[in-house]
Amino acid sequence: MKKLSIFFWLVSFFLGTSIVVSQTSSFDIIIHSRIDTSKPEIKVIANLWIAYLNSTPDRLYDNPHWNLEEKNKYKYCDYFDFSIPHLYQFPSTQLLNYFKPTILSIEKEGDAYGIRTIFFADGLEGMYRKSNPWCIVKLYAIQENGNWKLKNSLPIITKDWEATTIGKITFRYPSSHKFNKKLAQKSIEFCNSITKEFQFPAWNPFDFYITESGDELGKLLNFDFSFGGYTTGMGLKKYGILLSGFGSEYYPHEFIHLLLPNFNRHSMIEEGFATWKGGQGGKSFQESAEILAQEFFKNDTVTFENILKKEWGWQHAAFYTLGAIICQKVYEKGGVNSVKKLLETPNSNDKLIENICSILEIKRNQIDNFCRTEVLKYRLK
């Protein structure tokens, strides 16, 4: 839900302004006067971080500024720096020319150094001023074979956390959190029941990191503060990690992302299925559908394409919820096998519409009326 509103803002900001985007990969990076670069070690770390920012960090390659252990651990994943997909929602060559980095502090923390950097834009006007700064990143520098390299915050922050393994899930949480064994067991039962109902392959073990808020979760993703990367939950299947900002051992929506078979499916179907079976934003599928139905009732011009392109309803999780309603309708029509066919929808808007129409036996020009009819069935009288 939150991610959709940020996406809308990003498109508006980068594509709707008259500012010309520079494509240079050399950025104006300020070192705050609090940082004493006369100290050789501090200067080396500052230069390391500056070099990394100028190395097109959003491009996946063997970046020499990052530690080898994490590069090897995540070599088959999409990125090794956990901040990448949230910080660079537009290419670094664009983003870093708007939100210019200022290194705020480089402080010794045990054997590592914590590096904090604010990404702030000059000269923003109107509504865009409310979205400044973009974020404050905090990650670490560690010694590796006599050289300083960058490292994610997650293993450093969580190294002294408690860990409880139940079934295939290892729950990791700070000592201040009171572990709820009943909810943990409920999580195992949920994962097993979904896998059985939809005949998914056996699910792999994963680590479930429990925090109390989106801000605390953000720290595990290298953010002291974030706008573009703010979230209260994330399932990272390739990494075997689930992150929660709800302070609970039970997070069915995110479990779904770790249970679904690997496939580059359309996000409306992936998020729709997760919302249908696991709710979203702390609301059940039924509650989300009722909210969307009320908004549909107030607007008789909204189309399927408006929601698909996130032009309408992002503040009501319309993209997620409409996907869930489609999943429910497909299930009513053809059961589990039809839902599994829907889950094989490729990541293409045209293929999405084609597959929905084929499974539900409707014509392409009927999809708007179909969606309106199905959504309004959830309206409270």
Region locations from a protein language model:
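Bacterial Sec-dependent N-terminal signal peptides
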Residues: 1-26
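Short, low-complexity N-terminal intrinsically disordered segments enriched in polar/charged residues
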Residues: 21-55
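Short solvent-exposed beta->alpha transition segments
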Residues: 30-33, 58-106, 217
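Soluble non-cytosolic domains of exported or imported proteins
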Residues: 35-44, 177-189, 242-250, 264-268, ...
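Surface-exposed, charged secondary-structure patches
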Residues: 80-128, 241-244, 252-255
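Short beta-strand edge/turn micro-motifs at domain boundaries
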Residues: 128-161
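Juxtacatalytic substrate-recognition/specificity segment
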Residues: 161-266, 351-355
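Acidic/His/Gly-enriched intrinsically disordered linker/tail segments
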Residues: 242, 264-381
